[in-house]
C-alpha cells in the first residue's frame, strides 16, 4: 500500500452484481482478483462489529432503526439482499469476523471505513468501535493488509494517536474540499497517508481540480478517487497522480486499467 503501483479497490465489494457489503459481493470481488476490498464498519448495541454502509437500516433492509440501537442477533435476522434483487432474499448483514474468514488466507488488502461518528454517537462509542476493529485485525494477523479510513478526522486522529503508524490512514477530502464529519486538531498533511479526493464545486469532478492532486504530492499523500469507470477520466486521473481507483464496477475498471497497461492480464 505504498503507492508503488495503482490499486483497484472494490467499493463495498462487487456491488454492481451483488448487494453491497454482503458476503456474495465480497466473494465475487475476491474471485475476480481486485487488489483491495473497501467496506464499512458499524458497532451494534451489544458491541459486535458489522459491515453495512448506512447507520440507518432502511435503505438496504427496509427496516426502521439504526445499527447502534440493534443487537447483533437483531441485525443478523434482517434481509440485506432483497432491495437489490429477489435473488438475494434473506442475505444477512455480515460481521467483521465473517469477512476476515473469507479473505484471511488470500493476499487481499482491506480498506476499513469506520462509519460510527463522534458527532452522532459520542467519542466513547466511536472510539470503541475503532479499538474493537483494530483488536480484531490484530487477532487475525492482517495488520499489514489493512488501512483505516473515515470521514471523521476525529476518529482518524484517535487511531493515529493511539496506534501511530501501525496502519495507513485514509482520509476523505482535503481542506479545499473538506467533507469530514468531525474535524480534529491535527493537520491533515500530518495525519493522512491516503486521501480520496472530491470536487471543490458540486456537480464537477475531482479531475477538475488538479491543485488537490498537487497538494497531495507536495505533502506525500497518496491520492485516490471513487468515480464513474470511464476510459477518458481514468487517463486524466492517472496523469494527475491517482494511485487507487475505488470502483463500483470492478469488471469495467479492470478492463480500463489493463488497456492502459496498468494491470496485468
Regions found by a protein language model. Give the residues of each.
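Phosphate-group recognition and catalysis centered on beta-loop-alpha active-site segments
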Residues: 1-265
Amino acid at each position: 500500500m505504498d503507492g508503488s503501483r495503482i490499486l483497484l479497490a472494490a467499493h463495498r465489494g462487487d456491488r454492481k452484481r451483488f448487494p453491497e457489503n454482503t458476503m456474495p459481493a465480497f466473494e465475487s470481488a475476491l474471485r475476480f482478483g481486485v487488489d483491495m476490498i473497501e467496506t464499512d464498519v458499524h458497532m451494534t448495541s451489544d458491541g459486535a462489529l458489522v459491515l453495512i454502509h448506512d447507520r440507518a437500516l432502511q435503505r438496504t433492509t427496509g427496516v426502521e432503526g439504526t445499527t447502534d440501537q440493534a443487537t447483533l442477533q437483531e441485525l443478523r435476522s434482517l434481509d440485506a439482499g432483497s432491495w437489490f434483487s429477489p435473488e438475494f432474499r434473506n442475505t444477512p448483514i455480515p460481521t467483521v469476523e465473517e469477512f476476515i474468514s473469507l479473505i484471511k488466507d488470500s493476499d487481499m488488502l482491506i480498506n476499513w471505513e469506520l462509519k460510527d461518528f463522534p458527532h452522532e454517537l459520542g467519542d466513547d462509542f466511536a472510539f470503541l468501535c475503532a479499538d474493537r476493529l483494530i483488536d480484531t485485525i490484530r487477532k487475525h494477523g492482517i495488520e499489514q493488509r489493512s488501512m483505516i479510513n473515515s470521514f471523521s478526522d476525529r476518529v482518524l486522529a484517535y487511531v493515529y494517536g493511539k496506534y501511530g503508524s501501525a496502519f495507513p490512514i485514509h482520509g476523505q477530502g482535503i481542506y479545499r474540499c473538506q467533507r469530514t464529519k468531525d474535524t480534529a486538531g491535527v493537520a491533515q498533511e500530518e495525519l493522512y497517508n491516503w486521501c480520496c479526493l472530491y470536487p471543490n464545486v458540486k456537480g464537477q469532478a475531482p479531475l477538475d481540480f488538479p491543485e488537490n492532486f498537487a497538494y497531495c504530492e507536495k505533502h506525500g499523500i497518496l491520492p485516490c478517487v471513487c468515480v464513474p469507470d470511464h476510459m477518458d477520466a481514468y487517463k486524466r486521473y492517472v496523469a494527475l497522480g491517482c494511485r487507487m481507483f475505488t470502483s463500483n464496477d470492478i469488471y469495467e475498471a479492470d478492463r480500463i486499467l489493463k488497456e492502459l497497461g496498468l494491470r496485468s492480464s
